[in-house]
């Protein structure tokens, strides 16, 4: 691609109130370094768990770190799609997005090292067919498609896959599980801090995905059907991952119940439809400075905090 101009030099400069640059500024303001998290108490807490509890938690962590690594590798075509569309603000935000995914991979690996889990953990994903289909097939296929087809419809499919189903259902459910483990047992303070930091980053990621789908739906109502179809295709797969995880254990640790996590994941997925559909027929200029996508993620976080405070 030949460069003919620089958007940062345009009259009026950049629109710092636009959603992508608002998220970019937020990420800068909330920067954190994995090396600053204290994991010193987590090793003793980890060893105090039963073998069954450690096995469950290791499988949960394996899903997280493999997912963070996958997105670090797969997200680049979305940046190229933003460049092709001439959206510098989105491109700036996605550079931060990719950096944060790499940082999340780093911090989960640091935690595993700190608690002594240094063996090959790939086997913890072998018995999770829905997880492997989502991360080994659906995610890379939907994002790699943008390299040859950066169209709005392809962007909506990619965002629905990653931002709305993987982050917006599967990851949120996993964070909820970690919070339940740590808060109920009052253990693993390093993991608690790790999840808090990552969760804050990923609320911005999900908000960007919602914003992206909303602007495409506002521009062309046909993209609403694209979003709806992709979500309806992948939500059952996300819920199947919970089934797969629970089916591996005759005895379920931590007092967990499959129905609780299925309901949690389904609720987060279904509530995303309303936020996207509310953009139908809206002016694009309104969508660009509408912060409701971020407000939705903050609402989810506040709800979780109330539930966990009650159970503590």
From Swiss-Prot:
The main enzyme category here is oxidoreductase
Its EC number is: 1.-.-.-
Q: Name one GO biological process term.
A: deoxyribonucleotide biosynthetic process
Crosslink (3-(O4'-tyrosyl)-valine (Val-Tyr)) position: 71-162
Could you tell me the keywords of this UniProt record?
Answer: Iron, Manganese, Metal-binding, Oxidoreductase
Q: Where does Fe cation bind?
A: 101, 167, 202, 205
A molecular function (GO) term: metal ion binding
Residues annotated as binding Mn(2+) are: 68, 101, 104
Q: Which cofactor does it need?
A: Fe cation; Mn(2+)
The free-text cofactor remark is: Binds 1 Fe cation per subunit.
Q: Which InterPro entries match?
A: Ferritin-like_SF, R2LOX, RNR-like, RNR_small_fam
Task: Spell out the subunit comment.
Answer: Homodimer.
Homology family = Belongs to the ribonucleoside diphosphate reductase small chain family. R2-like ligand binding oxidase subfamily.
What is the role of the protein in this entry?
Probable oxidase that might be involved in lipid metabolism.
Instruction: Please identify the protein, giving its name as recorded.
Output: R2-like ligand binding oxidase
